[in-house]
């Protein structure tokens, strides 16, 4: 008699996607981050659901309701700390997942890659509106600055800003709709994840060698399911330790102060995981130019498959020059953003941000395609 998981209409779908999925036998730990992102999404939805039961989206009580959760709700402090720090771990896994896709040429699976970029935008939107909800000083001013960027849109900019705000400033209407978006968007992300997986399983997973692995595949369970469990254990242990011992390490001290529209913080900045994009926004003096560059810094990921000039699937892994350029990109992403953006707008941080922004776009649009073309010429 056939197993129920192979015959039941619903269980058969889950079985083909998780249990009996043919998987390349040589995928490394870098392929764990997809499942870790799924774990982060589930953890964020669950903790967020419990927080939403006690949170009030009213500017008069939002800040005190978060304090109430931490002080009076059973394990509310733990749930809040796991949710706040879970967002950071979500983005760590997300950026590592994207980096692996770039390094090993997974972007050539165009549908999967483009849905992944849409997922990145959705997660960034979710994190942004969620950051506003505690109604702290940096939350309020961050929302004011970022939403005000819509005023750079020609002709309809001011109307757009007032439409998003629900008035003439960031106020009660803004907080209410941001809470609604923050509750809704994770479920849209979950739906997009399913589409991402459907496209991925149409073509099959990539592997470190970039070769066709149809003749060398093994079932996902038990080989890689147990491997993923190790990743789950490491992630949950690290997240729990951070939430218990240093819960405010990745936060902003200004958010311990209730939002005050009359007092502007000395330096308005977003959470650390948005700094690379904020660095590009701030490096351009013109508002419209900065907004376009900000969007381009994310959407240029969709251009990566189109700018692939190498005859190899994964030039970053196999060619010394493109490998060097890839690690230059990683070097630009990590140290230069916090260095130039966690500081005031003054010399030399402005010029560092501008140089890093030029390097960022040059790598994707010029240097990496040129290196692939040069490699093809060398191999002829």
Swiss-Prot record:
Range of residues in the leader sequence: none
Per the record, the GO terms for biological process are:
mitochondrial electron transport, ubiquinol to cytochrome c
**The record's free-text note on cofactor binding:** Binds 2 heme b groups non-covalently.
Membrane topology reported for the UniProt record? Multi-pass membrane protein
Q: Which PROSITE patterns match?
A: CYTB_CTER, CYTB_NTER
Q: Which CDD domains match?
A: cytochrome_b_C, Cytochrome_b_N
Q: What does this protein do?
A: Component of the ubiquinol-cytochrome c reductase complex (complex III or cytochrome b-c1 complex) that is part of the mitochondrial respiratory chain. The b-c1 complex mediates electron transfer from ubiquinol to cytochrome c. Contributes to the generation of a proton gradient across the mitochondrial membrane that is then used for ATP synthesis.
Q: Which protein, by its recorded name, is this?
A: Cytochrome b
